[in-house]
Design a protein with these regions (language model features):
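C-terminal motif of bacterial Sec signal peptides marking the signal peptidase cleavage site
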Residues: 3-5
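Mature catalytic domains of secreted/periplasmic carbohydrate-active enzymes
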Residues: 9-251
């Protein structure tokens, strides 16, 4: 036994596949967290809003974000993602970039900020907070133009600087199609790989929220499994082709 204890330790083998970043390991250890999909559509029986729904229809008078978070904690969840803006373009924080937001609703007489209320509740009860921000915007007249990309980046910067630490940023892969677009009511297409300038977005996130995992069907932190049934490959479910795949461009 003493001889075996004196034997030199065996060097660990070199990695033959990409190894995860520490923040990816930390994300895996979270195990289970909630996703709250809430907004104008909640009050208008829609899954995807067209971009023309009247903000006056949004008035969750009895909303209590602390009640939400206490429920998540009781269920053993370690965080929550919230839809700050879905494809309809309606913003659940009082953004300074568009009037199509919570400031122009009856909720708290235009003084509400559900992104802020939920972030504060998460901090109070000790769970992590994250945001979903749809790149596609069926409300904005300038969607599919370079001007919209600047608008989208500025929205993301607002969310990343005003609500404390986030553990994840979720970008949806649904991009381009028919929409209200400021009254144009037409169909628009984009170059899904290049339009949003994701390399610049990743630089912003590394600067403002370096601990945050980026989720999309192209990662780069964690990716959509490829279907909505919950099935994944046994050995390669978390591999990503960095620099080749992007949100909305998973080819």
């Amino acid at each position: 036994a003493m001889l075996s204890a004196c034997e030199p330790s065996v060097k660990a083998p070199e990695a033959i596949l990409p190894v995860p970043e520490q923040k990816q390991i930390d994300w895996q250890k979270m195990e289970t967290y909630a996703f709250v999909h809430f907004g104008l559509n909640t009050f208008n029986d829609r899954e995807w809003g067209y971009g023309d729904t009247d903000p006056a229809t949004f008035n969750p008078a009895k909303l209590d974000c602390e009640q939400w978070v206490k429920t998540f904690v009781a269920a053993g969840m370690k965080g929550v993602i919230f839809t700050a803006k879905h494809h309809d373009g309606f913003c659940l924080w009082p953004t300074q970039l568009t009037e199509y937001c919570i400031r122009n609703t009856p909720y708290k007489e235009g003084k509400g900020d559900i992104v802020g209320e939920l972030a504060a509740a998460c901090k109070k009860y000790g769970i992590k907070f994250a945001v979903y921000l749809s790149p596609w915007d069926r409300h904005q007249a300038n969607y599919a133009s370079p001007e919209y990309v600047d608008y989208f980046h500025k929205q993301l910067r607002e969310l990343m600087t005003n609500y404390g630490e986030v553990f994840e940023v979720w970008f949806d892969g649904a991009n381009g199609g028919d929409g209200w677009y400021g009254g144009a009511k037409d169909t628009r297409t984009i170059d899904r790989k290049n339009y949003y300038n994701y390399p610049k977005i990743y630089e912003m996130l590394d600067e403002l929220q370096p601990q945050a995992i980026v989720f999309s069907d192209g990662g780069p932190g964690c990716r959509w499994v490829g279907n909505e049934a919950g099935f994944a490959g046994a050995t390669n479910w978390s591999f990503l082709r960095a620099g080749e795949v992007f949100p909305g461009y998973a080819k």
